[in-house]
């Protein structure tokens, strides 16, 4: 069920038993209304607290950035692999610290050709390491 951070009321009000229940949080920093600077994105990723209701898992997230800059040269993943490595690592660490874990938007997309939404492509392009534990070695936060 959706976490209280969705702002749609008490997700437990209609449930009589919470055994085996967990909350799902979809967190897309792309839509956070941040200043379009890489430091603002890293700051948000490093400090976000997704805890709210417990247990919660971040069941959807990506490396996408605001639509106004996502296709500019400065923000294209192939032009700044280092930023996207840090952006990925910061989110992984935050979601593992303040939630019960995470699930990236998609393992593989068709036709999109954007590693910000495609985990396998991000691995192939060197943005995400094959071993997700390396997030703690990137020095993102």
Where are these regions (language model features)?
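Short, Lys/Arg-enriched charge-dense amphipathic segments
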Residues: 16-30, 124-141
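Substrate-binding cleft of secreted/luminal carbohydrate-active enzymes
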Residues: 52-139
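Extracellular glycoside hydrolase catalytic/binding regions
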Residues: 1-89
């Amino acid at each position: 069920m959706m976490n209280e951070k969705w702002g749609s009321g008490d997700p437990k009000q209609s449930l009589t038993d919470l055994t085996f229940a967990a909350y799902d949080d979809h967190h897309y920093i792309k839509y956070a209304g941040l200043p379009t600077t890489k430091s603002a994105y890293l700051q948000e990723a490093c400090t976000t607290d997704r805890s709210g209701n417990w247990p919660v898992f971040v069941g959807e997230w990506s490396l996408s950035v605001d639509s106004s800059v996502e296709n500019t040269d400065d923000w294209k993943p192939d032009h700044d692999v280092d930023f996207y490595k840090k952006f990925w690592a910061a989110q992984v660490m935050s979601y593992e610290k303040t939630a019960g874990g995470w699930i990236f938007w998609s393992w593989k997309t068709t036709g999109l050709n954007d590693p910000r939404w495609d985990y396998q492509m991000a691995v192939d392009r060197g943005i995400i390491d094959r071993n997700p534990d390396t997030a703690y070695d990137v020095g993102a936060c």
